[in-house]
From Swiss-Prot:
Protein name: Histidine ammonia-lyase
Swiss-Prot/TrEMBL keywords: Cytoplasm, Histidine metabolism, Lyase
Family: Belongs to the PAL/histidase family.
Entry superkingdom: Bacteria
Organism, scientific name: Staphylococcus aureus (strain JH9)
Gene Ontology CC entries for this record: cytoplasm
Length: 504
């Protein structure tokens, strides 16, 4: 598959397919023409010795300092070197790859003044899978993701570290190996590379993809739990959900009915009890609300993926050219969205932990043994798996605190309000990793509970899931190191996302 970039129409589904199929990037001719036109404006500014921020002046507090024309290119290299102050563990290779795609896409809008050489260098790095090593910490989320994107830019000019064919190498060595020259930054290009929200947005895209997948995975896991507890299926009837109007809730209820169709373990209202606890009865309402959040996040991310968030921006209208210093680099819209994503995923984990508690609690699990122990007393069974899940959801409650309500001044109070969007992105992904493990714990426990109930009673669809995951997690016949089971399921759930055939 080839992903065609035009600066206007990139979607998250495009990114997902690109990652699944190890695709290449091609650029639409019209987009290249826009790049040429915006670059011509920069060249005219230089020729006419105009005063324009970041082209003929310094940056931030130094915006009033005029730069000698012989030092315009040096200014851009100095910018990249000085701003590469990222700290901590690097972003994943998927996030770094998406970051390059998003930065390339915004340059193709033709408002940044980049050269074709810069555009082609980004395309080369993407297609050859030369992945810049980009530390996660150090961004305030306005003026964009300066520190992370500076590390990306370092790789392009042959000064940074990269991951290439599974090995960490100097960018310059990889370029030499591939007979490719480092990029020679021209006026405006350093700024064009780092003034933007691509770090938070790239992490947000990966987080959205994995969060949405977790939402779907949580449904069949919940269906296993539901059957193991002889849950009441009436609560999922279409007429119940249609009168509330939330389409996502209606959709979850329909999928739950589909997962449970043909089960002999489900019950009807008043057959065993009149109604179930909320964690079973309200799955469509709770999970559906998370999908509402995911849909909002997707919309915001796709707006930003196709946005011009550089500064200054170059415009041409009716044969008139003008360059405007604005603030499209400010990450507030994405920061809000990613804080919402944290809430949506946290709730999937919260309700999962409460469901698995019902499976192991002898006061709540019907006729199942306490903690599903094969020999209660001598063997503890799933007792501490519930502890682990409780620990993860409690950690999520701390991580879910909104990063976007925080701000701190920088650059001598010139940049006096920031979004903290990249912090929201980082914390959000940790919540996703935690939630995936909570769902993995529910899966391990629900598999055992279903076995004790009798797998012949499972619906055909959940029976297939049972068989699929029993190949990863064997029956619990005695106490063992359950962390291995949990991690095996969590990794299997994650790996399925980037395969062309999804697991759910």
């Amino acid at each position: 598959m080839t992903l065609y970039l035009d600066g206007e129409t990139l979607t998250i589904e495009d990114i997902k397919s690109f990652l699944q199929q190890q695709s290449k990037i091609e650029i639409i001719d019209d987009a290249l023409e826009r790049v040429k036109k915006s670059r011509a404006v920069v060249e005219r500014i230089i020729e006419n010795e105009e005063t324009v921020y970041g082209i003929t002046t310094g940056f931030g507090l130094f915006s009033d300092v005029r730069i000698d024309p012989t030092q315009y290119n040096e200014l851009q290299v100095n910018l990249i070197r000085s701003h590469a102050c990222g700290l901590g563990e690097p972003f994943s290779k998927e996030v770094a790859l998406v970051m390059m795609i998003l930065r390339l896409n915004t340059l193709l809008k033709g408002h940044s003044g980049a050269t074709l050489e810069l555009v082609r260098q980004l395309q080369f790095f993407i297609n050859e899978r030369i992945i810049p090593i980009i530390p996660q910490q150090g961004s305030l989320g306005a003026s964009g993701d300066l520190a992370p994107l500076s590390h990306l830019a370092l790789a392009l000019i042959g000064e940074g570290k990269v991951l290439y064919r599974g090995e960490e190498k100097d960018s310059d060595d990889v370029l030499r190996e591939l007979n490719r020259q480092p990029l020679n930054l021209q006026a405006k290009e350093g700024l064009a590379l780092i003034n933007g929200t691509q770090a938070m947005t790239a992490q947000g895209v990966i987080s959205y993809i994995e969060a949405e997948d977790l939402g779907y995975q949580s449904e069949w896991i919940a269906a296993l739990t539901h059957q193991s507890l002889n849950g009441i299926i009436d609560a999922y009837r279409h007429d119940v959900h249609s009168v509330r109007n939330f389409q996502e809730q209606i959709n979850v209820a329909a999928r739950m009915r589909d997962w449970l169709e043909g089960s002999t373990l489900t019950t009807r209202q008043a057959e065993i009890r009149v109604q179930d606890a909320y964690t079973l009865r309200c799955i469509p309402q709770i999970h559906g609300a998370s999908f509402q959040v995911f849909n909002y996040v997707k919309q915001q991310l796709e707006f930003e993926m196709n946005a011009a968030n550089d500064n200054p921006l170059i415009f041409e209208e009716a044969n008139e050219t003008f360059v405007i210093s604005g603030g499209n680099f400010h990450g507030q819209p994405i920061a809000f969205a990613l804080d919402h994503l944290k809430l949506g995923v946290s709730e999937l984990a919260n309700v999962s932990e409460r469901r698995l508690e019902r499976l192991v609690n002898p006061q709540l699990n019907g006729d199942l043994p306490a903690f599903l122990s094969p020999e209660p007393g001598l063997q503890s069974g799933a007792m501490i798996m519930q502890y682990a899940a409780a620990s993860l959801v409690s950690e999520n409650k701390t991580l879910a605190h909104p990063a976007s309500v925080d701000s701190i001044t920088s650059s001598a109070n010139q940049e006096d309000h920031v979004s903290m969007g990249t912090t929201a992105a980082r914390h959000g992904y940790q919540i996703i990793e935690n939630a995936r493990r909570v769902l993995a714990i529910e899966c391990v426990i629900a598999l055992q509970a279903a076995e004790l109930k009798g797998v012949e009673g499972l619906s055909p669809k959940t029976r297939r899931k049972y068989e699929e995951f029993r190949s990863i997690v064997p029956s619990i016949t005695h106490d063992r190191q359950f962390h291995k089971d949990i991690e095996a399921v969590a990794q299997y759930l994650k790996q399925s996302i980037y395969q062309t055939t999804a697991c759910h």
